[in-house]
A protein has these predicted regions:
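A short helix->loop->beta-strand "cap" motif at the edges of active sites that frequently abuts
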Residues: 6-11
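Structural beta-sheet core signal
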Residues: 13-15
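Alpha-helical scaffold elements within enzyme catalytic domains, especially in hydrolases
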Residues: 3-4, 38
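Generic structural signal for well-ordered alpha-helices
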Residues: 1-2, 33
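Catalytic His-Asp segment of secreted/periplasmic serine-dependent ester chemistry enzymes
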Residues: 20-109
Length: 109
């Protein structure tokens, strides 16, 4: 993460991985997410971890369908790992919201 900060001249946005259907992969994803969170805290200033887990896998459990801002969609591909187009749109919205909160993007009027 530090290498992407370019000496403090930029921001780093890192996304956690939503829990997949497979419990075996789930253990790996939880370890990866814990490492992402630790690294983000250790580096500190200039790093934002955007946590997708609460939206896509509330309670850390796989969900095919999620409700986001009042709309329920099938958020995952049939493989139980990848996001569907609707799921990717939700993830993009979360990233855009964070960028706007950081004033890295203009707010909509």
């Amino acid at each position: 993460m530090r290498s992407y900060l370019r000496g403090g001249r930029s921001m780093v946005y890192w996304l956690t991985l939503p829990t997949p259907r497979s419990e075996g992969f789930g253990r790996v994803y939880r370890a990866v997410n814990a490492a992402i969170r630790r690294a983000g805290k250790r580096v500190g200033e200039g790093v934002r971890v955007i946590d997708l887990v609460p939206v896509f896998t509330p309670g850390g459990r796989f969900r095919q369908n999620v409700t986001f801002r009042g709309r329920t969609v099938s958020a995952r591909q049939p493989d139980g790992v990848h996001l569907s187009t609707a799921g990717a749109s939700i993830a993009a919205t979360l990233v855009i919201d964070r960028l706007r909160a950081d004033r890295a993007l203009p707010r909509l009027r």
